[in-house]
């Protein structure tokens, strides 16, 4: 019996030492910014500390919304046929490391082309005047009129490697009719 146990132990040991060691884990990247909109007050104008919420056309602003225990930012044009507003993050310090932006977005009741959700980045936003900053549009996947209503989709990984130091990320929603909306959730920079 001892001999069988010894043999079994040695075979097991040989099996483990014969494994390929080429498996490696991807490098760890720390999260430098997260906004999941979970600590908010439902159906109020979005006023999270550090964010800018600016109506460019019309009077519609981004709102704080809560549905089924999930918080998110919503741009819903209820009164203005043509409206546009910017939701701008607080400054995010990217440091000197290559970073990635990711977020989720959804739409509802988009009746026609012309309504858009765009994402921008700036290194020179002063916190109040959107026209004085140099905004660069980022290529992100955002919902279209063909995206299922209320279904959050991934933006994809947006490479921010061309940027260092402090930046602001802006979400600009434009509507050409009332009753349609965009949602933003889970903004992450890592």
Go through each PLM region and give its residues.
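Bacterial N-terminal signal peptides that target proteins for export
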Residues: 1-8
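Terminal, low-complexity interaction segments
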Residues: 141-190
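Extracellular ligand-binding interfaces
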Residues: 104-141
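Extracellular glycan-recognition surfaces and repeat-rich motifs
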Residues: 33-77
């Amino acid at each position: 019996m001892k001999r069988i146990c010894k043999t079994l132990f040695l075979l097991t040991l040989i099996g483990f030492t014969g494994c390929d060691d080429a498996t490696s884990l991807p490098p760890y990247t720390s999260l430098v910014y997260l906004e999941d909109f979970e600590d908010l007050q439902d159906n109020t104008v979005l006023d999270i500390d550090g964010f800018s919420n600016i109506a460019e056309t019309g009077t519609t602003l981004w709102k704080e919304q809560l549905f089924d225990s999930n918080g998110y930012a919503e741009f819903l044009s209820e009164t203005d046929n043509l409206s546009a507003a910017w939701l701008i993050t607080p400054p995010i310090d990217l440091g000197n490391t290559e970073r990635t932006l990711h977020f989720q977005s959804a739409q509802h009741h988009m009746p026609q082309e012309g309504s858009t959700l765009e994402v921008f980045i700036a290194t020179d936003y002063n916190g109040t005047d959107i026209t004085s900053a140099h905004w660069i549009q980022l290529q992100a996947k955002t919902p279209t009129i063909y995206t299922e209503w209320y279904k959050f989709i991934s933006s994809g990984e947006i490479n921010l490697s061309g940027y260092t130091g402090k930046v602001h990320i802006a979400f600009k929603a434009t509507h050409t009719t009332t009753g349609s909306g965009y949602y933003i959730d889970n903004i992450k920079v890592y």
